[in-house]
């Protein structure tokens, strides 16, 4: 029997709620049809935002939403997306399908969506094709509470009060679609552009996110950190609050992006290969984090994993540029495993945004007209929401088995444990095995307190189990009963291919 030893007297870092963040780009049917249907739609909506989607995201406790991209961000000119919708300029979405973007969802709509969701805002600026002035004026338009050209324009467009920008990305993937820049050049551009991302609110600072590496480009991290810290007072920690990291899990091949593998039809070998590639996130955090430690030992700069998840082939018959893919228990296990990894590294990882929110890549929901279905990944985020803002507890797995074989071998069980402000302990676990359940003895080292299970939920299913509009509850969150309270904690039996959440109360 595997054991999880929990030192519930050793509270470590706080798990930032933003680790459970999401990403919405003008790509495929993420914004249009997914989130936004317009005020005149027959689909129930509030100010154009789908009611069913907003309600489900609030239930999931979405903490932060990133917009407008992605690669789209570095060709997006924000002034095209304000004012009367019938007068907004159209553009070609060159990155994603070559479709016409009518800009009916712009700045006002994004902040209205976040208001309805009750979540923080992460705006990604255009460094690749935009100007310093354009970026500066966007921040002024959004946040300045006074008399100025941009504030006056915002008021003319119907919003008297300013909004709050919680996070601002100064460019996106500038090593690639955001300008194909060298790290030193981007870092110099970052230093210049971020200067004009001004804090107009005073008591509400904007957290500035610097474009970090693609996957394992450790040289990018070194050179960007070195350039940003050069001739910079230590108290400004490189003029950044976060450094982004992008990593997608490709199921079938990592050499040819044209052969990523099916989202629903795969072998057991590909299943374990996918999980092992998802597990690579741990190494990426450790190695990029070690470089960041050289410049920022106090961890003032968060590692911001603002694009992650499984990227598979699109569903047959759909636009290849729309990145619409199904979502199975394989996705759920990668999500649960990855979120547990983020929790364990919450001293450095301060935000993460799975790609993407709806109808694109590893989304939490899919829509078709007025129909909406929750994916297995949705339920993982819903079950693990209790970690948001809680204190990470020191925990370790002892005697755990492995699954897969050869280069695809990885731990059978992943876990993380936290305690919230009310003293409730949350334990989240994944069983990555397709063949066997796993008995786990969760032992709390503080013998003075007696805990018992107050809530237990789980999802399970075949590796390719997924929800459709015709069968929306093939994978569904249910009460978990395979546990026994003990003198030191709780013993559980994790079903094969499952994600489990336990809540322990005194």
Name each model-derived stretch.
Residues 1-242, 281-282, 286-506:
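Non-catalytic accessory regions flanking glycosidase/transglycosidase catalytic cores in CAZymes
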Residues 216, 230, 239-258, 263-267, ...:
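Long, well-ordered, tryptophan-enriched scaffold segments
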Residues 276-277:
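Beta-strand-rich domain onsets/edges
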């Amino acid at each position: 029997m595997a054991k999880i030893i929990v030192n519930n007297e050793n509270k470590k870092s706080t798990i930032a709620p933003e680790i459970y963040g999401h990403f919405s780009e003008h790509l495929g049917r993420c914004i249009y049809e997914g989130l936004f249907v317009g005020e005149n739609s027959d689909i129930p909506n509030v100010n154009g935002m789908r009611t069913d989607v907003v309600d489900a995201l609030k239930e999931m406790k979405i903490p932060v939403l990133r917009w407008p991209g992605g690669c789209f961000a570095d060709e997006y000119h924000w002034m095209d997306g304000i004012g009367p919708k019938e007068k907004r300029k159209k553009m070609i979405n060159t990155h994603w399908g070559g479709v016409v973007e009518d800009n009916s969802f712009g700045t006002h709509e994004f902040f209205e969506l976040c208001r309805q969701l009750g979540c923080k805002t992460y705006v990604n600026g255009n460094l690749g094709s935009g100007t310093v002035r354009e970026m500066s004026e966007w921040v002024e338009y959004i946040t300045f509470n006074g008399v100025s050209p941009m504030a006056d324009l915002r008021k003319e467009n119907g919003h008297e009060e300013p909004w709050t920008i919680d996070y601002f990305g100064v460019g996106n993937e500038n090593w690639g679609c955001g300008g194909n820049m060298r790290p030193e050049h981007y870092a110099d551009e970052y230093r210049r552009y971020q200067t004009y991302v001004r804090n107009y609110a005073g008591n509400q600072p904007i957290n500035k996110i610097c474009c970090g590496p693609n996957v394992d480009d450790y040289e990018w991290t070194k050179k960007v950190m070195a350039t940003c810290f050069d001739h910079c007072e230590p108290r400004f920690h490189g003029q950044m609050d976060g450094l982004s990291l992008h990593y997608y899990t490709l199921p079938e091949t990592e050499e040819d992006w044209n052969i990523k593998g099916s989202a629903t039809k795969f072998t057991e070998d590909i299943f374990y290969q996918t999980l092992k590639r998802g597990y690579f996130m741990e190494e990426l955090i450790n190695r990029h984090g070690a470089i960041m430690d050289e410049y920022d030992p106090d961890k003032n700069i968060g590692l911001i994993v603002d694009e992650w998840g499984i990227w598979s082939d699109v569903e047959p018959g759909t636009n290849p540029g729309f990145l619409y893919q199904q979502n199975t228990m394989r996705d759920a296990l990668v999500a649960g495993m990855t979120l547990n990894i983020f929790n364990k590294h919450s001293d450095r990882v301060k935000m993460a945004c799975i790609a993407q929110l709806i109808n694109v890549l590893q989304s939490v929901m899919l829509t078709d007209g007025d129909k909406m279905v929750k994916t297995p990944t949705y339920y993982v985020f819903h079950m693990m929401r209790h970690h948001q803002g809680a204190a990470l507890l020191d925990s370790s797995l002892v005697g755990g088995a492995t699954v897969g074989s050869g280069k695809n071998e990885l731990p059978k069980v992943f876990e993380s444990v936290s305690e919230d402000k009310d003293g409730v302990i949350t334990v989240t676990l994944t069983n990555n095995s397709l063949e066997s359940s796993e008995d786990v003895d969760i032992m709390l080292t503080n013998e003075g307190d007696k805990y018992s299970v107050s809530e237990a939920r789980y999802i399970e299913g075949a590796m390719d189990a997924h929800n459709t509009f015709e069968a929306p509850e093939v994978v569904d969150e249910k009460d978990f009963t395979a546990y026994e309270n003990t003198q030191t904690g709780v013993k559980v039996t994790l079903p094969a291919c499952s994600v489990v959440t336990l809540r322990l109360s005194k």
